[in-house]
Curated annotation (Swiss-Prot):
Alphabetical list of InterPro entries matching this protein: Thr_lead_pept (IPR011720)
NCBIfam families cross-referenced by the UniProt entry: thr_lead_pep (TIGR02077)
Keywords for the protein's UniProt record, in alphabetical order: Amino-acid biosynthesis, Leader peptide, Threonine biosynthesis
The protein, known as: thr operon leader peptide
Gene Ontology biological-process entries: threonine biosynthetic process; transcriptional attenuation by ribosome
Keyword flag tRNA processing: no
Amino-acid biosynthesis listed as a keyword: yes
Family, similarity comment: Belongs to the thr operon leader peptide family.
Function as written in the Swiss-Prot or TrEMBL entry: This protein is involved in control of the biosynthesis of threonine.
Length: 22
């Protein structure tokens, strides 16, 4: 996910939702 790199602050939150794993 490219937008993950842009949102460094929300990375922790995305990991919980499953986006961080991707």
């Amino acid at each position: 996910m490219q937008y993950i790199s842009l949102n460094t602050t929300i990375i922790t939150t995305t990991e919980t939702t499953g986006y961080g794993a991707g």
